[in-house]
């Protein structure tokens, strides 16, 4: 049983007395009667009224199960309907308990992206069609959270998030980091307080009825001062049902947060008892061009503790604009391509999808890391399936397997298992596959487990693969083994030596470096060998980061004598 309520503001433009009746009729859900409250109002005045009632078993809204009801307001005069308006509403509960962020009592993980409103032809105006396609693409990539960076989104976007199931952090249109965060910050002068409070409260009033909005963000990178303290108090006076977030001053809000922590730092928050708040990463995995590294490592750390809520990748969509070339073709361009100076170069190309909503390679990495089903092999060679969902079982999925032999599919079939419940782990045997009984020596076998939708969803068709894992099977060990005479090992305080017929190898006892390799009495090295690795630079590095010695060590190999 759950107590539900509604607060309404009504203005009657008629001179004569009218009558207001507000029925709330849920669709396809148990409900004890129809809530109805007549109210007589006189013309040209504003009234506020509230409506309370009890549901026996309401279907709660979550990103996994976005159950919605329809609220209908009817204005009548002398028994005749003058006007009707309706709105979709959802019932869900957001609380913080014991430093854990809970939605409907469960410690959900927010698997998110930061989203700017951007279209390659219309700029910051985004069509309703693109908004819907973006949300559907998010759902297909297992993204369940959006941080509206760094301003409230188009009203239609919240409607879509209510409908499809996306947890939203709504963020006020405040950013002044050009002044940085010291005494010059606009967050300090009292004359700037009304501007801060007005923008934040306008966001709260406009979007407070959306179940998808599960937290308020006071702004982004705008200093820690008293103006945000005043605004936070105003938010709490208006809405106690959602926690607040502000990365630049964790002390005044409900959530703890920072930007771009290391994986180790993220992992350390799991056991940090001196930090008494849920931990949320407002920006991480900066995805400029070929970046977004360590995403799986981040999520190993995030999933190590209920106190770590999750986070939002920077960011969702490239903010490029089309430029028509002399040959008539269109090219997605960024800073400097329009002869604009100064500019920020490719800094607007941080997306998980291209400006035209084409998935980038990172999109598929996000989809796999964010997936809500994990499959692995147990030590005794069985298949372990973990349902990471908090509210739904695995009955909506067809589970299939494919056996590959050196990468080529040789067998496939269905994996019949009981549907794992929310947060449940089940273990099943590997299917009886003839090719596994007669494995070829030295051949690499892998079992791919796939989870596909049994039915159409609003964001994907039947048969769409939402999750998969590839399980590496042991290689058959029947290859001939090379036989060599036993060697000799000698240990000293400064070096360890392995020797055999006509050779010896020395390792530095302190560093582990390969110090010398001698063959037939002839030393081959002038200096000890050391790791000298080179990788392609990421687009995150050429700016300020590339000036740090730590970065140069990775990108600039040095020659060694050998």
Identify the residue ranges that each predicted region occupies.
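Beta-strand-rich binding/interaction modules
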Residues: 6-7, 11-29, 386, 392-413, ...
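Extended acidic/polar, glycine-enriched regions
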Residues: 7, 11-95, 453, 457, ...
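Intrinsically disordered, low-complexity Pro/Gly/Ser/Thr-rich segments with frequent PxxP/GP/PP motifs
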Residues: 32-49, 54, 408-439
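Beta-strand/loop-rich accessory regions of lumenal/periplasmic or secreted enzymes
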Residues: 62, 430-442, 455-457, 470-556, ...
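N-terminal carbohydrate-binding accessory modules
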Residues: 74-137
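Substrate-binding/catalytic cleft of secreted carbohydrate-active enzymes
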Residues: 135-141, 145-350, 354, 361
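Catalytic cores of secreted or luminal carbohydrate-active enzymes
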Residues: 328-377, 388-396, 437-477, 524-526
């Amino acid at each position: 049983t759950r107590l539900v309520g509604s607060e309404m503001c009504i203005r009657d433009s008629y001179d004569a007395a009218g009558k207001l009746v507000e029925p709330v009729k849920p669709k396809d859900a148990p409900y004890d009667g129809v809530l109805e409250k007549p109210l007589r109002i006189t013309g040209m005045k504003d009234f506020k009224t509230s409506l309370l009632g009890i549901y026996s078993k309401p279907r709660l809204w979550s990103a996994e199960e976005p159950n919605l009801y329809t609220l209908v307001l009817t204005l009548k005069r002398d028994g005749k309907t003058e006007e009707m308006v309706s709105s979709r509403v959802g019932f869900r509960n957001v609380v913080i308990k014991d430093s854990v962020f809970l939605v409907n009592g469960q410690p959900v993980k927010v698997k998110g992206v930061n989203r700017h409103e951007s279209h390659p032809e219309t700029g910051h105006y985004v069509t309703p069609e693109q908004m819907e396609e973006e949300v559907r693409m998010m759902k297909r990539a297992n993204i369940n959270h959006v941080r509206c960076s760094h301003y409230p989104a188009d009203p239609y976007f919240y409607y879509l998030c209510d409908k499809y199931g996306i947890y939203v952090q709504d963020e006020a249109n405040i950013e002044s980091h050009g002044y940085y965060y010291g005494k010059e910050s606009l967050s300090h002068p009292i004359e700037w307080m009304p501007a801060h409070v007005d923008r934040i409260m306008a966001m709260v009033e406009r979007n407070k009825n959306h179940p998808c909005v599960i937290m308020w963000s006071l702004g982004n990178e705008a200093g820690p001062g008293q103006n945000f303290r005043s605004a936070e108090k105003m938010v709490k006076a208006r809405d106690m049902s959602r926690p607040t977030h502000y990365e630049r001053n964790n002390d005044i809000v409900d959530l703890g947060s920072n930007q771009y922590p290391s994986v180790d730092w993220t992992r350390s928050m799991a056991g940090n008892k001196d930090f008494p708040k849920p931990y949320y990463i407002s920006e991480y995995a900066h995805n400029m061009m070929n970046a977004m590294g360590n995403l799986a490592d981040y999520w190993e750390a995030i999933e190590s503790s209920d106190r770590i809520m999750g986070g939002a990748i920077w960011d969702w969509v490239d903010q490029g604009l089309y430029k028509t070339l002399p040959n008539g073709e269109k090219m997605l361009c960024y800073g400097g391509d329009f002869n604009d100076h100064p500019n920020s170069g490719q800094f607007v190309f941080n997306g998980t999808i291209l400006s035209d909503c084409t998935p980038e390679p990172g999109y598929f990495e996000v989809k796999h890391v964010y997936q809500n089903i994990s499959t692995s092999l147990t030590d005794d060679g069985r298949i372990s399936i973990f349902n990471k969902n908090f509210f739904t079982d695995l009955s909506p999925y067809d589970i299939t397997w494919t056996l590959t032999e050196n990468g080529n599919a040789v067998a496939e079939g269905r994996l019949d298992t009981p549907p794992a419940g929310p947060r449940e782990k089940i273990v099943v045997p590997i299917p009886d596959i003839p090719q596994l009984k007669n494995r070829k020596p030295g051949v690499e076998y892998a079992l791919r487990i796939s989870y596909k939708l049994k039915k159409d969803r609003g964001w994907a068709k039947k048969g769409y693969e939402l999750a998969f894992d590839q399980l590496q099977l042991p290689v058959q060990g029947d290859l001939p083994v090379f036989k060599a005479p036993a060697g000799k090992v000698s240990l000293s305080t400064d070096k360890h030596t392995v020797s055999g017929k006509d050779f010896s190898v020395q390792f530095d006892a302190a560093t582990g470096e390969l110090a010398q390799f001698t063959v037939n009495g002839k030393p081959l090295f002038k200096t000890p060998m050391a790791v000298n690795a080179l990788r392609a630079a990421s687009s995150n590095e050429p700016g300020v980061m590339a000036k740090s010695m730590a970065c140069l060590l990775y990108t600039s190999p040095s020659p060694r004598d050998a």
